[in-house]
Structure formats: C-alpha cells, structure tokens
C-alpha cells in the first residue's frame, strides 16, 4: 500500500511529466550503496494502529476513488482525441493537403526526405512547401541524435552468438508462467493498466538527468525533466553548470555529465573526444557543446557515477506505474522469490557473446590464426616503395586524399594501394592476393601485434571489420619498428589499451571523429590513401599533422 494515495491518484490524472521533487526523491540513491535493505522492515507501509476491518474499508474507499478518477480522465482524453480527429478530417487544410499529396503522386515528382520529415517548429519552414497529411511512426533512432553544439540565443545492430546460462526446460518454465488466473479477478483494472502500458511503451520522450559537482558531495545526479529534446532542455536551463557536456544515452534516459566534473574526478578522457578547448568554452558561455559517448568511455562514466542505479530506479518507477498496482504486486512478489532462491541471477537467460568462440582462440603461443599466418607468409619479402617528399604532392594533399577512387576494403585492393608505387601499377602486391580476410576480434589483433612487435624490418598490414552490418573498421600497417593505426569507434576493443601493451614500438594513430557510419567508411578510405603517401615517404609527419588540424577534417592524429 503506498504511503500517499493522493499522490498516486494525482499521478494518473496529471500530465505525463512527473513532479520534479517527487521524482528526485524516487530516484535518490542511498549514501551507502553497499547497505542491505532486504532484512529491514518497512515500518511506513501502513498505519500501525488500524484494525484489519478499518484497513480494508480504507483500501476499498481509496480504490473506488482512484478507479473513478482514472475512468473520468480516460473518457476525457478519448473524447478530446475523437474531436480533434474529426475536426482534422473535415477541415479544409486537411482536404487541401490530401489533394496535394494525390497530385504529387500522380505527377511522379520526388521530394527530399528533409522536406517531409522536418522536425522544425517554425512557421516559416513550411512556406512554399506542400503539406502532406501522412501518418508515420517515428522510430526512436531518428530522435536519438545528439547535436554537437547548441546556443542559448538560438534555443529557447550487432551480429552475435547467443549463449544461455540455464537449461532450456527451466527457461521454458519461466516464460510460460500463466498469470491469467490471478488477473481475471481484476479484469477492469487490467484494461486501464494496459492502456497506460501501451502509452508508456510508445512514448518517445526522454528522462533527463544532470550530473554535476555537488555542494557537499563530490558529485550529484539531479533529475531535470521529461522532454522530447534533451539538448534544448540543458541549453535553456542548465548551461550555467557547464557548457561542455558528455551525453550518456541509456534507452529513454539521458545523463548530461559535466566535462569539468569528469576532469576533476581524474577520469581519463579518450584523445578522440572532440569537445572545444577551455578558451573557446569561456569565450562563448551561452553555447553548449555536446559529445555522445559510448563503448569503454561510456562504461567508465556509468560505473563512476552509478548511472546504472539511476537508470534502473527510473525504469522501475515508470514501468511499475504503467502496469498498475495489482500487476506490480504480483511482479514484485515473483522477483523477490527469484532473489531469494538466486534464480534471478541466472535468468533471463540470453547473453550476447562479444568474444570469439573458444575453438577459434589460440591454444598456445605457437598457434596462429590462418589470417595472420597468411599475412606473415606472403609479405615476408615485400617492402613499401620509398620515394622523396615532393612539394607537388604536399600542395595537393587534400585533393589526393578526398578524391573518389576504386579502392575497396578487400585485402587485395588495400595491398595494391600500399605496395604499388604512387601513381603506378607495379604489381608488387600480387602475392598478397592469396590472403583471405577474416572477421575481426581482439585475439586476432593481439596475435598480429605479437608476431610483429619484435621484428624490426618487416613491412605488412592487416585490415579488420567488426560488428557485422555496423562495419566498424580497423587497419594496422607496420613499417619496421613503427605501427600505423586507422580506427573510429570500435565497440569490441579499445585501441588505446592495445597500444599500451606494445610500448616498445612507435605508434601513429589516426582516429576518425564526428562522423556517422557512412562518413566513417569514406574517411577510412581517405586515410588509407593518406597512409600510402606516408608509408612511401612522399609526405612528412608534419604535413599529416597540419592536415589533421584543419577545422573541416574528420580525424585527429597522435603519435604514441
């Protein structure tokens, strides 16, 4: 029984955004995260001096009031929706839009997607364009993009193998549990909770939290608001906290983490993070700069600031409210039973295996992946052509790197690029056509590096793809004692951690930044062409550094 039935009743009758103070209290973490509350009785769950009959009468009275209030609200919303739908269908604007859509279809004209899918709220944006009354389901990923920069003056799949940790009969028994016998007793409430649950699942807004430096604690996590645009909310109301922000997105919860706080906490910030420098941030205090984080850095922020706890509490509160009181009671009882018998930590049941299967792992240091063995065998007597830096190439560097070419990410195509002299067809890489590329994984990278780290004379390279359709790419080229890395964001491995393992060698790292998947593929090919010039000594490292410092380039260069 909730402590405050009036508050619960208002939550069903009010707007979708929860009360700020109530939500802060509901998502507040205890000071000691290791303190166990399972054995502590909850004294505030019911009045201590009430008799059983009085308690039942109170429950019945409050339940009737709640049911009446919910029915009234649902009826009001249903009436309003029907009125709006009828008005829209009969309005001249809707008929005009429908006629315009039919005319456009008959004429076979094409329009850019941006004209139809524009999210702009400005009245001027619709002038001169046809309005199309086209029902469309807006998928969440379209709204998940984080703007790199906003201004206060302007704003007011991964291919995996699935493994299980429980026997199939246990899994089937868990998922086949029948709740109907219990739920039929409260059928009317189940229908209302189903409506709430459907609205909850289809909601596309975000719960926004701000992670900032605390007055009495090292940091604090504050609930901001339930909004459709997290960056606008932060820019309008929290820009004074810090105008440089790391954005941690966990489904429909977004954490806006202060850049200054991360730096003060001594957390290592990856070198490819592309937030503005201190001088620019101070010079433009009304501009907010946002950097979405993922993979290893995201895991670090989640662990350090306990964001997983805030996400779990937020999800529990909103989900339990959506399914209703009776269903919540059954679910919590079931969860507590599973916690008691420890089955909660072996179910459910399906885990994504990020590492290669065991049979692909090398059994000892003398075992080699077929891919690595072929590279070492067929590149044994090959060397990258060597020339002299020329002013003509330096002056045309950007043009050479960004011009279209027939280069693909096949091993033979990259081999022809790197081992044939620039501007010629020498057929130096014919032997490498026999190399069969394999899918990338961490063990394969480590084995390639281990075979090459103590060889000071060989020239070779490896190309790897991770993540199936996501097409995350990694290229490593070796010339003598030096390694050249081309990479973007790779979910399965950390390039920086790998480089630290091979400190004996010199590493040149080209990190692709601030691009989508398609641009990442294009820029990876561009950097391969840049690497050709560098390996063949046609340009100097100073030229590479100067090119990477340009404002419109999509990569950063670092020597380790």
Swiss-Prot record:
Alphabetical UniProt keywords: Early protein, Transcription, Transcription regulation
Question: A biological process (GO) annotation for this entry?
Answer: viral genome replication
Q: Which residues form a coiled coil?
A: none
What is an example of a Pfam family matching this protein?
A: TATR
Region (Disordered), start-end ranges: 1-25, 99-134
Family the entry assigns: Belongs to the nucleopolyhedrovirus IE-1 protein family.
Question: Its biological function?
Answer: Regulatory transcriptional protein, which trans-activates gene expression from early baculovirus promoters. Can also trans-activate its own promoter, suggesting that it is autoregulated during normal infection of insect cells.
Q: What is the protein name stated in its UniProt record?
A: Trans-activating transcriptional regulatory protein
The species this protein belongs to is Orgyia pseudotsugata multicapsid polyhedrosis virus
């Amino acid at each position: 029984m909730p402590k405050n039935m009036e508050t619960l009743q208002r939550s069903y009758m009010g707007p979708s955004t929860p009360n700020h103070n109530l939500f802060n209290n509901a998502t507040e973490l205890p000071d000691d995260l290791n303190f166990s509350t399972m054995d502590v009785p909850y004294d505030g769950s019911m009045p201590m001096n009430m008799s059983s009959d009085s308690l039942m009468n109170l429950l019945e009275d409050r339940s009737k009031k709640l049911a009446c209030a919910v029915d009234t609200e649902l009826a009001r919303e249903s009436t309003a929706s029907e009125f709006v739908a009828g008005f829209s269908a009969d309005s001249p604007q809707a008929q005009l839009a429908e006629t315009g859509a039919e005319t456009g279809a008959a004429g076979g004209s094409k329009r850019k997607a941006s004209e139809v899918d524009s999210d702009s709220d400005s009245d001027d944006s619709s002038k001169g364009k046809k309005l199309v009354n086209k029902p469309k389901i807006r998928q969440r990923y379209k709204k998940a993009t984080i703007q790199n920069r906003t201004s206060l003056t302007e704003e007011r799949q991964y291919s995996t193998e699935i493994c299980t940790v429980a026997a199939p009969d246990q899994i089937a028994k868990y998922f086949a549990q029948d709740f109907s016998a219990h739920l039929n007793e409260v059928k009317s409430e189940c229908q209302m909770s189903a409506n709430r649950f459907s609205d909850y699942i289809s909601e596309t807004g975000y719960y926004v939290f701000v992670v900032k430096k605390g007055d009495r604690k090292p940091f604090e996590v504050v609930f901001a608001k339930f909004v459709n645009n997290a960056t606008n909310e932060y820019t309008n109301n929290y820009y004074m906290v810090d105008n440089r922000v790391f954005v941690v997105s966990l489904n429909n919860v977004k954490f806006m983490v202060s850049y200054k706080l991360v730096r003060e906490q001594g957390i290592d910030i990856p070198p490819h993070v592309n937030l503005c420098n201190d001088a620019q941030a101070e010079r433009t205090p009304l501009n907010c700069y946002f950097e979405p984080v993922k993979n290893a850095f995201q895991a670090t922020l989640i662990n350090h600031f306990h964001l997983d706890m805030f996400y779990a509490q937020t999800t529990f509160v909103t989900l339990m409210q959506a399914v209703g009181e009776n269903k919540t009671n059954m679910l919590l009882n079931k969860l507590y039973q599973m916690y008691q018998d420890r089955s909660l930590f072996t179910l459910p049941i399906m885990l994504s295996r990020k590492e290669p299967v065991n049979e692909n792992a090398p059994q000892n240091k003398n075992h080699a992946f077929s891919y690595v063995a072929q590279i070492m065998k067929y590149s044994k007597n090959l060397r990258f052509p060597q020339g002299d830096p020329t002013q003509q190439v330096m002056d045309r560097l950007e043009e050479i790197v960004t011009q279209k070419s027939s280069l693909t990410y096949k091993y033979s195509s990259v081999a022809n690029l790197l081992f044939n002299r620039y501007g010629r067809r020498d057929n130096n890489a014919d032997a490498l056509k026999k190399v069969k590329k394999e899918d990338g994984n961490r063990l394969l990278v480590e084995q390639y590096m281990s075979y090459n780290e103590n060889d000071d004379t060989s020239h070779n390279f490896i190309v790897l793809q991770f993540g199936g359709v996501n097409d995350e790419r990694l290229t490593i080229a070796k010339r003598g004692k030096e390694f050249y890395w081309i990479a973007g964001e790779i979910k399965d491995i950390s390039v920086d951690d790998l480089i630290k393992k091979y400190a004996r060698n010199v590493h040149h790292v080209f990190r692709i930044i601030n691009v989508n998947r398609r641009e990442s593929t294009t820029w990876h090919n561009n950097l391969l062409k840049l690497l050709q010039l560098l390996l063949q000594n046609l340009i100097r490292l100073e030229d590479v550094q100067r090119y990477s410092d340009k404002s419109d380039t999509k990569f950063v260069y670092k020597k380790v």
